[in-house]
Amino acid sequence: MGEKKPEPLDFVKDFQEYLTQQTHHVNMISGSVSGDKEAETLQGAGTDGDQNGLDHPSVEVSLDENSGMLVDGFERTFDGKLKCRYCNYASKGTARLIEHIRIHTGEKPHRCHLCPFASAYERHLEAHMRSHTGEKPYKCELCSFRCSDRSNLSHHRRRKHKMVPIKGTRSSLSSKKMWGVLQKKTSNLGYSRRALINLSPPSMVVQKPDYLNDFTHEIPNIQTDSYEAMAKTTPTGGLPRDPQELMVDNPLNQLSTLAGQLSSLPPENQNPASPDVDACPDEKPFMIQQPSAQAVVSAVSASIPQSSSPTSPEPRPSHSQRNYSPVAGPSSEPSAHTSTPSIGNSQPSTPAPTLPVQDPQLLHHCQHCDVYFADNVLYTVHMGCHGYDSPFQCNVCGCKCKDKYDFACHFARGQHNQH
C-alpha cells in the first residue's frame, strides 16, 4: 500500500518533463537556446525518463496530436492567435504554426520509406505515396480523366473544360450529385452559354422576372405554370450545344428559354395563302433577344392580339426579316422597346443566312447623300459634316465638292486641309 502513494507525484513530474521537452524543441527551432544547454537538457530528460520507466512520445508526434496545447515562447496577437517569429503569420493551433515554421527552418520530418522524398507537410507525403501505389482517387466528372492529386484535377478542369473554381459557401449537396444534375440539365437545354456554374441549390430554380408580368397574360396559349416548369421541360427546336456551356442565374437565359417555347407554338390568325404577309395589320410583334458567344442574335416574334380599331392598316414590306426600332409609333407597346432583328415564322434551329433588311420608314434619312441611318447619333454626326451654306461643302475644312459621290470620297480619304 505504501508503494502506490507516490504514483500521482511521479505522474505530475513526468508531465512537467514532457512540457519541458516541447518547449525546448520550439526554442531550438527559433535559435534562442545554445547548443550546450540543449545537450544538457535532453540528456537530463532522457535520464529521468529511464529512471521512471516511462517512454515519452517523440516531439514531432506530440506536436501534431496536441494541437490545442499552448507552448511557451510564442508571441500572441491581439485576437489570441500564436504568431510566427519570422513573419506575420498567425494561427490558433500549435500544430499549424509548427508546420509553418518548418518553411523558414527547412525541416522536413515526413519522409518516404521508398525513395528520398521528404516534406514538411504530412498531406504532401500522402499525395506522394499515391505515386508509388498507383492510386488515383480524384476523377473528372466531365471526362474519364483521373489523377492522384486534387490540384492536378483543378488544373485539368481549367485547361480542358475552361472551368473557373467558384469561391463561396459550400452547398449541402455533394459535388458529385450536383455535377450529375448539371450534366442531366445540359443534355436537355439547347441554348449555349459560357461556363458559369454555381453549386448552390437555389440557383437551379428558374424564377419569373418582374418585367415579364406586363405581357405574359396577353400572349395566347401561354400560362404561368408553363413558365415555372421550364426547368423540367425540354424546348423543341433547340440547337445541340456543348454540355459545358450552361448558365443558370442569368435572366437573359430565362428569356431565351421562353423564346424557344414561344417559337414552338403554332401561329394563330394567319392567312395560309400568303405566309410572308401578316393577316392582321394591327398585330404587334414582340421580340426577345438571345445573345450568344458567337455574336449571333436570334429573336422570336409572337403575335399579341390587340383590340379592334377603326384605323386603316398600314402597308408593310413583304419580306419576312424586319427590324423594329423604339420609334415605331404611338401604337407600339412599352414592352416592345428593344430594337433587335427578328426572323418571322422560323424556328430557332434555322440560322439566318443574311442580315435583316431595315425598314426605310423607321430610319433617319440624309436627303443630300440619300443615305439611311438606324442610329440617331450616327445621323447627327453625318449631318454635321455637311456645310451650312452648301450641302456638299465640307464642314471640317471648307472644301467644296461637286456632288454626293465627291463628298463621300473626300471624307473617305480623310484629307482635310484648312484653306
Swiss-Prot record:
- Key words of the record: DNA-binding, Isopeptide bond, Metal-binding, Nucleus, Repeat, Repressor, Transcription, Transcription regulation, Ubl conjugation, Zinc, Zinc-finger
Q: Where are the zinc fingers (C2H2-type)?
A: 82-104, 110-132, 138-161, 364-386, 392-416
Where in the sequence does UniProt note compositional bias of the Low complexity kind? 297-311
GO molecular function: any one? chromatin binding
Main localization of the protein? Answer: nucleus
Q: Which domain of life is it from?
A: Eukaryota
- Glycyl lysine isopeptide (Lys-Gly) (interchain with G-Cter in SUMO2) cross-link, renumbered residues: K5, K185
Q: Where is the composition biased (Polar residues)?
A: 262-273, 332-349
What does the entry list under GO cellular component?
Answer: nucleus; protein-containing complex
Q: Which SMART domains match?
A: ZnF_C2H2
Note down the stretches annotated as region Disordered.
36-55, 262-284, 297-356
Q: Which InterPro entries match?
A: Ikaros_C2H2-ZF (IPR050589), Znf_C2H2_sf (IPR036236), Znf_C2H2_type (IPR013087)
* Residue spans crossing the bilayer: none
Q: Does the keyword NADP apply?
A: no
Location of the protein in the cell = Nucleus
Please give the record's comment on domains: The N-terminal zinc fingers are involved in sequence-specific DNA binding and heterotypic associations with other family members. C-terminal zinc fingers mediate homodimerization.
Family label: Belongs to the Ikaros C2H2-type zinc-finger protein family.
The free-text function statement in the UniProt record for this protein reads:
Transcriptional repressor that binds the core 5'GNNTGTNG-3' DNA consensus sequence. Involved in megakaryocyte differentiation.
Q: How does it assemble?
A: Self-associates. Interacts with other family members; IKZF1, IKZF2, IKZF3 and IKZF4.
Extra remark beyond the main annotation: 'Pegasus' was the winged horse in Greek mythology.
Q: What is this protein called?
A: Zinc finger protein Pegasus
Natural source organism: Mus musculus
